[in-house]
């Protein structure tokens, strides 16, 4: 099972979201810990992956050799790709 770690930026972005959305993001991250590659999509031109949660996106850096899912950034889809 993978462990989940957050960057400082991702932590700040998470706490800026509404409480209901925060809980939804954390619940989905907890569910993907077992098989993360089943739920994500590769972000073009980068080594990162995208997890879609409604209208929000979570940018992930996955290290399969260490079993770590590193959350680099998250937010609403209209702002996350800038």
Q: Positions of the model-derived regions?
A:
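A short, surface-exposed loop/turn module that caps and links secondary-structure elements
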Residues: 28-51
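Enriched for short, Lys/Arg-rich terminal
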Residues: 1-5, 9-12, 16, 20-23, ...
């Amino acid at each position: 099972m993978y462990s989940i770690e957050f960057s400082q930026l991702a932590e700040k972005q998470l706490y800026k979201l509404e409480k209901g959305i925060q809980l939804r993001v954390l619940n989905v991250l907890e569910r993907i810990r077992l098989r993360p590659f089943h739920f994500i999509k590769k972000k073009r031109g980068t080594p990162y992956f995208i997890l879609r949660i409604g209208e929000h996106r979570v940018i992930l850096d996955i290290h399969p050799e260490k079993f770590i899912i590193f959350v680099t950034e998250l937010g609403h889809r209209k702002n996350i790709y800038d």
